[in-house]
């Protein structure tokens, strides 16, 4: 008794499938040049230590301070990196050079404004989707090995 409704339901589904018109089927072409994968890549820069002109208070403006940078830079790519083309990667050496150039002859009052300048510079590379940045002053407080900030900034894909 209970099996009959199930068998009838299966028969009806098979009958409908057999009698479908060809127009109901959609043919999809596969573009062989397009990758079926997205790569989520991350560049890591750990413990970049620089002497910077940094600080709000007068005593901080007397001499450069040791500052440590840690960065995680996320980007997506639709293809694997090429072993022959440096432009196919987000180059960590270039990022370090950019940060050094950015801070070379400039005084920052706050770590937060320094971070914004780093973000502005790095987000010029349109591949970069998200940056997590940690900046620490290493010698400013006797009771702490470091004090600092950590900020993450993500590119918005919304249209203005």
Predicted segments with their positions:
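N-terminal, polar/charged subdomain of small-to-medium soluble alpha/beta proteins
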Residues: 11-160
């Amino acid at each position: 008794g209970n099996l009959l409704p199930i068998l009838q339901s299966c028969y009806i589904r098979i009958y409908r499938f057999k009698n479908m018109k060809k127009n109901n089927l959609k043919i999809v072409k596969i573009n062989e040049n397009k990758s079926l994968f997205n790569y989520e890549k991350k560049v890591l820069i750990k413990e970049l230590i620089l002497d910077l002109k940094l600080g709000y208070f007068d005593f901080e403006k007397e001499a450069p301070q040791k500052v440590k940078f840690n960065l995680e830079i996320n980007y997506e790519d639709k293809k694997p990196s090429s072993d022959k083309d440096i432009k196919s990667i987000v180059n960590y050496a270039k990022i370090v050079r950019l940060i050094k150039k950015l801070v070379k002859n400039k005084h920052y009052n706050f770590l937060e404004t320094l971070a914004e300048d780093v973000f502005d510079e790095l987000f010029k590379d349109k591949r970069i989707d998200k940056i997590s940045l940690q900046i620490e002053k290493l010698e400013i407080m006797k009771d702490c090995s470091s004090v600092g900030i950590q900020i993450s900034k993500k590119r918005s894909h919304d249209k203005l």
